Design a protein with these regions (language model features):
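Intrinsically disordered, low-complexity segments enriched in small/polar residues
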Residues: 35, 60, 69-70, 76, 259, 410, 427, ...
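Membrane-embedded transmembrane-helix bundle of lipid-linked glycan/lipid transferases
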Residues: 1-402, 531-533, 539-562
């Protein structure tokens, strides 16, 4: 009770209310219906695919059981970790739209918390942390990502980027014993989105290179980076090891898919960098700036003098980092000479996520130092920011809705909203096996597979029957008098599928056939039974062991230190 009274101060209650308002305002767009953004159906399909895989007995769900029944290897390249809870809710019978709403709301809560923690530890100011968290959670790019783009990988990345920045700050400038923050940040972002992970690796590398002398001189800082990196890899082994195995053993449509993306198509004019509102047109994937409020607060930095040099130094670094990232979204950055890098990050707008984080941290710190010991001014600035940002969020949502209405006919949609009967969406189909001939149609710039069961053989004399359950197929065949007879089944081939006789464990050769599906050779068998299923590989088993052992080790170490 005493602890509760200690917490329930006027200041803490105000902070809680403001952050709660920020969380609700950033999620207000889905109080009624959810907009059918670019990837809304795609990520809802992930939830459905994982649930279907679980129901079929596949707990790892590396290959999602989709509506076509062919299977789609989403789980190898898009971690299932943060989709576990939504998938459980959906499996328990909750409406998929409601599940998605709960997921987005949880992301908003987590986002406001991580940015508050980040700025609080850097600035040692609750005031700065509150402003940073509020601006970050309600920044226009995040609203556009939530409403129009529905890029869940970026939405999740908003949560973990503040932790990566805080980890960098602790390891380079302050307490090296807090290296584990860097680990948490990278484990989170690796399980959120591979492209955002790549971007944060580049940003972290720049920070390290700019401070390399300091890091090399202080062995504690160097050891901290090594420990943080190794631990992040060990904890995340269950995701990245199976992914790398697939990339080595199989070929995917992503090689062609990468050619679909050119950063030069999505660049902004310099004047739009801080616009923060959607523009009408058929292209709804470019960046649209962070919001004018960030540049206003950044200019106020010039009015601060003779304060904590170290804290102001990081504030200035944050402003510089944010500006550089924004400039990368303009024609001033030489994307035409960096086609490989551009193809990997797909859209320069992704750089707005870390840019928003840096500007939010700097904004909170500037407001803190500018109004320190000036209570009335502090309250006025605080109030102006809250009122302005709330109004701007509603303007941003309205611009998003207008843009979706404008593009509705272009996308062939019946409504700007999505309903629970949406069609299963695999987006650009980048994780299909190479050669897959998808019977598809354009849905939110993505591919939808039509349900079909197509079995075929190169031996018309061979008779066979089949029974399919999920991503498992049982085949009974007879009258095979040819040596090279094969049967193709309607399941996409990914490394790990096996074919064997369930009675005597005889193995049958299996490979990728026409249109990327599984082809099994009957070889010299005149008749028999074949069971085709996905078998957990040695690498996958090893990765699970590494992750579990590492997590157990962390628990033991934490208990001992406590």
């Amino acid at each position: 009770m005493n602890k509760l009274k200690k917490y329930l101060t006027k200041e803490n209650i105000t902070i809680t209310i403001v952050l709660l308002v920020g969380t609700i305002i950033s999620s207000v767009f889905m109080f009624k219906q959810v907009y059918n953004g670019i990837d809304t159906a795609y990520h809802m399909s992930r939830i459905i695919g994982i649930t279907n895989s679980w129901k079929a007995g596949d707990l790892l769900a590396y290959i999602h059981l989709n509506t076509s029944g062919y299977g789609y290897a989403m789980g190898f390249f898009y971690s299932n970790l943060f989709m576990i809870l939504p998938s459980i809710l959906y499996m328990l019978g909750m409406n998929i739209i409601l599940v998605y709403k709960i997921f987005i709301l949880m992301c908003s809560i987590a986002t406001v918390i991580t940015m508050y923690i980040c700025t609080k530890q850097i600035s040692k100011s609750k005031y700065a942390a509150t402003i940073s968290a509020f601006l970050y959670t309600t920044c226009s790019y995040r609203i556009i990502t939530l409403v129009v783009k529905a890029f869940v990988g970026e939405i999740l990345s908003f949560i973990f980027i503040p932790l990566i920045i805080l980890g960098l700050y602790q390891l380079i400038f302050e307490d090296t014993k807090k290296w584990w923050i860097f680990t948490i940040g990278f484990v989170g972002i690796l399980n959120s989105n591979l492209v955002m992970t790549e971007i944060m690796i580049y940003i972290s590398a720049v920070f390290v290179l700019c401070n390399i002398k300091k890091i090399i001189k202080d062995k504690g800082r160097l050891k901290g980076f090594i420990k943080a990196t190794v631990l992040a890899l060990l904890v995340s082994a269950m995701f990245w090891m199976p992914m790398i195995e697939q990339l080595i053993k199989s070929t995917f449509h992503m090689k062609d898919g990468m050619n679909m993306y050119r950063p030069t198509w999505w660049l902004l004019s310099f004047g739009d960098l801080f616009n923060g509102l959607m523009k009408l047109g058929t292209q709804i994937t470019p960046a649209y700036g962070l919001g004018f409020i960030f540049i206003v607060i950044a200019i106020l930095r010039l009015a601060i003098k003779n304060e904590d040099a170290q804290k102001l130094k990081f504030c200035d670094i944050s402003i510089l980092a944010g500006l550089v990232l924004l400039l990368c979204m303009t024609k001033f950055f030489p994307w035409k000479y960096l086609k490989t890098l551009g193809g990997m990050i797909q859209f320069p707008s992704r750089l707005e996520v870390p840019a928003a984080a840096f500007f939010s941290i700097a904004s909170g710190m500037i407001c803190h130092y500018l109004t320190e010991k000036k209570t009335i001014l502090r309250r006025i600035i605080f109030g102006i920011i809250i009122i302005y940002q709330i109004g701007f969020v509603f303007m941003c949502i309205k611009s998003c809705e207008d843009a979706l209405i404008e593009v509705e006919l272009y996308r062939g949609l019946d409504s700007v909203y999505i309903d629970e009967n949406f069609e299963y969406d695999i987006c650009d189909g980048m994780y299909l096996p190479e050669g897959a001939n998808v019977q598809s149609k354009l849905i939110s710039h993505g591919r939808h597979e039509e349900k079909k069961d197509k079995y075929k053989t190169n031996n018309s004399e061979c008779n066979f029957k089949y029974a399919k359950n999920g991503l498992k197929v049982n085949i009974s065949f007879e009258n095979n008098k040819e040596v090279n007879t094969y049967i193709e089944v309607p399941i996409y081939y990914y490394y790990g599928y096996v074919a064997e006789n369930p009675e005597n464990n005889t193995k049958y050769k299996i490979e990728k056939g026409d249109e990327g599906v599984i082809r099994v050779y009957l070889e010299n068998s005149e008749s028999g039974t074949i069971q085709i299923y996905y078998k957990t590989t040695i690498v996958q088993k090893l990765s699970i062991i590494i992750t579990i052992v590492t997590l157990l080790g962390i628990i033991i170490c934490v208990k001992k230190s406590a």
